[in-house]
Amino acid sequence: MRALFLLALGSIPALVSGQLSGSVGPLTSASTKGATKTCNILSYGAVADNSTDVGPAITSAWAACKSGGLVYIPSGNYALNTWVTLTGGSATAIQLDGIIYRTGTASGNMIAVTDTTDFELFSSTSKGAVQGFGYVYHAEGTYGARILRLTDVTHFSVHDVILVDAPAFHFTMDTCSDGEVYNMAIRGGNEGGLDGIDVWGSNIWVHDVEVTNKDECVTVKSPANNILVESIYCNWSGGCAMGSLGADTDVTDIVYRNVYTWSSNQMYMIKSNGGSGTVSNVLLENFIGHGNAYSLDIDGYWSSMTAVAGDGVQLNNITVKNWKGTEANGATRPPIRVVCSDTAPCTDLTLEDIAIWTESGSSELYLCRSAYGSGYCLKDSSSHTSYTTTSTVTAAPSGYSATTMAADLATAFGLTASIPIPTIPTSFYPGLTPYSALAG
């Protein structure tokens, strides 16, 4: 339970001072829920033998405790052969201290929580985990189930748990509100379609999370408002993003702050191709990157998605500031790449204190198209007519040098062998400790 009005709003520009619209997290503590009623899955048929299907036991324990209580999954190894859909909870929690191993082969969601309020999923030891064994699918060029999906969940938190090797996406928050996600490690295979965290909804704080994969690190989708994402470690990932954005996009009041990105697709991307609607009031602040394919990549003609009918998604009032580090090859992929729709130009953009230098060669490019505002290759004009400009930079920008993280991976995890369960880091951004100490 956190009253996040106490965040230092004075340090945030006025355009995004309302990034959170109220308090986030569960309304009742896990200890209070446990004191009301505790439903130990061992009492409902679970056996920690990594063989007996734990799905029915979790479902039964939830039914007994969903109206007020705590579902307890003790330490030990459990096999999940049938997926669990947990619905209609109120003032309930799941304490995951054991490790759940996927043995089932169905599609869908291994663990789904829906239509629930005042909810908490956590490990008291920071060692609770779900191992998806996605490599079994990926080695054959296929995908399977997603690990965790929350749908229409309000006043919630997910923390101190580990998600590993999802057959598809790792963690999705679908139309959720007033939530907090923190102190997590997510580790997946090195290919697309294995998203780390996808979130759409309202008033959600995601912080102190490490993601390894090759797709979304922490990504906001539409519709979304008042989302705060900070202290994120994209450690050989796809990188953080917004989108993809299509018809009737509605995204506003989004803050990403203190994001460290290593050997990823990009430091941040906003991706669309046609479509309609708006993205407004966005702050991308304090980013460090090394070894990434792209750095800032706003692409209104993103070729990896099929074009959507419409003039394009209108981006307005976007601020990018205090970015440092290096990029793999800034001459082939501009560190500043702002490509907006000619028929829906970006307006009121601010690029400030961006210092990214190429790791290969001695020059890099900045590219802007139909993008208006201040800084670098943006045009400052009220006409908002289409244009494209490319500038060549031949000297390293002042202040680009930035620290690395000791836990930066030397190589990605492959697709043909089991990915080990990691420990949750004690830092997710250089020089910062988590807002909340790890549990246990």
From Swiss-Prot:
Q: Name one Pfam family in it.
A: Glyco_hydro_28
Under PANTHER family, the record lists: PECTIN LYASE SUPERFAMILY PROTEIN-RELATED (PTHR31736:SF19), PTHR31736
Arranged from A to Z, the UniProt key words for this protein are: Carbohydrate metabolism, Cell wall biogenesis/degradation, Disulfide bond, Glycoprotein, Glycosidase, Hydrolase, Polysaccharide degradation, Secreted, Signal
Report the enzyme's class at the first EC level: hydrolase
| Name of the gene encoding the protein in the UniProt record | rhgA
Chief localisation class: secreted
Protein name listed in UniProt:
Rhamnogalacturonase A
Catalytic activity annotated for this protein?
Endohydrolysis of alpha-D-GalA-(1->2)-alpha-L-Rha glycosidic bond in the rhamnogalacturonan I backbone with initial inversion of anomeric configuration releasing oligosaccharides with beta-D-GalA at the reducing end
Q: Gene Ontology cellular component?
A: extracellular region
Q: List the disulfide bonds.
A: C39-C65, C217-C234, C340-C346, C368-C377
Origin species, per record, is Aspergillus aculeatus
What's its EC?
3.2.1.171
Across the pH scale, how does activity change?
Optimum pH is 3.5. Unstable above pH 6.0.
